[in-house]
Design a protein with these regions (language model features):
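Terminal peptide-recognition signature
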Residues: 15, 29, 53, 76, ...
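Alpha-helical macromolecular-interaction surfaces
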Residues: 24, 84-85
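Vicinal oxygen chelate
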Residues: 1-8, 49, 61-63, 78, ...
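Extracellular/periplasmic catalytic domains that process cell-envelope and extracellular macromolecules
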Residues: 54, 69-70
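Core segments of cupin and vicinal oxygen chelate
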Residues: 7-9, 16-59
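A short beta-turn/loop motif at secondary-structure boundaries
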Residues: 43-46, 68, 104-105
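Short, solvent-exposed beta-strand edge segments and adjacent coil->beta transition regions
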Residues: 10-14, 71-75
Length: 128
């Protein structure tokens, strides 16, 4: 019997977001993308050392920044069934608009928002 090299149900690549306000980011992901929290390791002062949430078929890892690992903005792309509804949920959850959903030169209708933790979320629905 061989030992698995990764947890069951995890993809080989997972975004790791180091943010300012990990709890706020986790709550945003739950509200906007229906993320399910899998793990949370808080520090004694309530910050998040490490957390994992599942969005669709992907695990996203989240942690609060610190002196050794400062928060850094990232861009993450997420496919959703309804880009317009998800974009509006993100704005209602406090995100700032980067780009309203629009169809350009590829098969996707895509919009972008930036959350309070500094992550830019590109939200798309394929419209072949």
């Amino acid at each position: 019997m061989s030992v698995a090299y990764k947890p069951e149900g995890y993809t080989s690549v997972a975004p790791y977001l180091v943010v300012d306000g990990a709890v706020r980011t986790i709550n945003f992901l739950a509200r906007v993308f229906d993320a399910t929290e899998l793990r949370r390791y808080p520090t004694p002062d309530g910050r998040i050392l490490h957390a994992e949430v599942r969005i669709g078929d992907t695990v996203v890892m989240v942690a609060d920044g610190n002196a050794g690992w400062p928060p850094i903005g990232a861009h993450v792309h997420v496919y959703v069934p309804d880009v317009d509804a998800t974009y509006e949920r993100a704005l209602s959850a406090g995100a700032m608009s980067v780009q309203a959903p629009v169809k350009k030169d590829d098969a996707d209708r895509r919009g972008g928002v930036k959350d309070a933790g500094g992550t830019t979320w590109w939200i798309s629905t394929m419209q072949a």
